[in-house]
Regions:
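Dinucleotide-binding Rossmann-like beta1-alpha1 core, especially the glycine-rich loop
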Residues: 1-70
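Short hydrophobic core segments
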Residues: 140-150, 238
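Flavin (primarily FAD) binding-site architecture
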Residues: 147-162, 307
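Short coil/turn segments at secondary-structure boundaries
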Residues: 6-7, 21-30, 60-64, 99, ...
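Helical element adjacent to the flavin cofactor pocket in flavoenzyme catalytic cores
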Residues: 83-144, 303-304
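C-terminal catalytic lobe of FAD-dependent flavoproteins
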Residues: 79, 86, 92-94, 102, ...
């Protein structure tokens, strides 16, 4: 996937520029054993990695001696040195909602809790039929349909008479969240005897994120969940590298996602890692109407993928403008990455009753929109009810009015990650308040 890697590496600097509040640099450490032939190939790979990336604000790969390093505090003694390379972290749930907010601001109609149940030809247009969580049926006319349903892409295609031979392989990836394992902000890139790679990543300041597995997921009717086997696999993987002995009791939370990998002619590969992570855009005409399906794709290249989709559809929208997303920040991202600490200090100076953790969280979630959220706040009392862990009425109101939030899970997991900290009593307090608010 040389093309995909090149595109993703070039894209990192763009993402750091247009969304510096939810995307930031991260250094990854690869522990190595002495005199292993794999060390040479890993170093060659990293040299190519840096070369493909070209000029970047991210630092290049370096080598460190672990025996005289603080990194060696928990690593087993057999690991004597390490390579350290650069990549980026993206707050994925914030990325999704900020794109939706931006689209709405530019004229899009965002329908949450609404699913497509059918579509049909109506004259020279598509008629898309939807059903929301209240059972209401709505119909929409459009020139073309873009099937960007991710793991549900094949389900949507079943509504058509499509003759394409493309499909998706559903691969479940599970993650574990444990209390912070290290007192630094480096991530670990770990390789196993089975050829798989596991990451240990600093997560939400107080935790470490461990993942991910790769397991075939049969269909989306089955809710993806981290199995006991996956938990054992990840814990054993980590324990082979570090002196501590993580057990299931150390797991604070676990979650699973499903990746829809592109598959041609329903190819079945037992090795999930061998299936491409690249995306394929398939434009076809069904009853003489354009229908474009997106297969596969990665989070890193979401912007390029979206621009390529519109480029393919330009003939149907002759008034479409030129590409613009590279130069336009997502909501709250109108500052430079090196200005982030200064922005936190500015927030604290204007609102001295916000503690350090809350100020950091606001800038990491909302960027410059933090000042819009708090514009009418003059004192701590103006924040309203405190539901716990610095989540107050003023923030929840913003999420309800501006970020399409409707439920406790929306607020604690899909807009923030405060669900990691909230206990049952705090959740109930928030839920009871929402009953009177919505």
């Amino acid at each position: 996937d040389f093309k995909l890697v090149k595109e993703a590496l070039k894209e990192r600097d763009v993402l750091l520029k247009i969304m510096p509040h939810i995307c930031w640099p991260m250094r990854f450490l690869i522990p190595l054993q002495s005199f292993k032939i794999n060390n040479f190939f890993i170093r060659c790979g990293l040299l190519i990695y840096d070369y493909i990336a070209g000029y970047s604000i991210l630092p290049k790969t370096e080598t460190t001696n672990l025996q005289n390093s603080s990194f060696n505090a928990f690593l087993k003694s057999k690991f004597t040195k390490a390579y350290i390379y650069s990549d980026c972290w993206v707050e994925d749930s914030r990325l999704v909602v900020l794109n939706a907010i931006d689209a709405k601001k530019r004229g899009a109609n965002i329908l949450t809790r609404t699913r497509v149940i059918n579509f049909e030809k109506k004259g020279k247009l598509w008629n898309v039929i939807t059903k929301n969580n209240k059972g209401e049926i709505h119909e929409f006319l459009c020139k073309c349909i873009v099937n960007a349903a991710g793991p549900w892409v094949d389900n949507i295609n079943n509504y058509t008479r499509s003759k394409n031979t493309f499909s998706t392989r559903l691969v479940k990836g599970s993650h574990l969240v444990v209390n912070k394992l290290f007192d630094h902000n480096y991530a670990f890139f770990l390789t196993g005897n089975d050829g798989r790679i596991i990451f240990v990543i600093p997560f939400q300041d107080e935790y470490s994120l461990i993942g991910t597995t790769e397991v075939v997921h049969q269909n989306m009717d089955q809710k993806p969940m981290c199995s006991d086997e996956e938990k054992d696999y990840l814990l054993n993987f980590i324990n082979n590298y570090f002196d501590f002995n993580l057990k299931t009791d150390n797991i604070i939370s676990s979650f699973s996602g499903v990746r829809p990998l592109y598959s041609k002619n329903n190819q079945k590969s037992k090795n999930m890692s061998s299936i491409t992570r690249d995306y394929v855009l398939n434009l076809e005409f069904i009853e003489n109407l354009p229908f474009l399906t997106i297969y596969g794709g990665k989070l890193t290249t979401f912007r390029k993928l979206s621009e390529n989709v519109l480029s393919r559809l330009k003939d149907f929208f002759p008034e479409m403008g030129s590409e613009w997303t590279m130069k336009n920040s997502l909501p709250g991202g109108d500052f430079l990455i090196h200005e982030k600490k200064e922005l936190v200090l500015k927030l604290q100076k204007k609102y001295p009753f916000l503690d350090q953790i809350c100020s950091n969280r606001f800038i990491n979630y909302y960027g410059t929109l933090s000042f819009e959220i708090l514009k009418n706040v003059k004192s701590k009392k103006d924040l309203g009810k405190n539901f716990g862990h610095s989540l107050t009425e003023i923030e929840v109101d913003w999420l309800l009015k501006n970020e399409f939030a409707k439920s406790v899970d929306d607020i604690l997991w899909r807009r923030t990650k405060l669900g990691l900290k909230f206990n049952d009593s705090e959740k109930n307090k928030l839920e009871n308040w929402l009953k009177y608010k919505i």
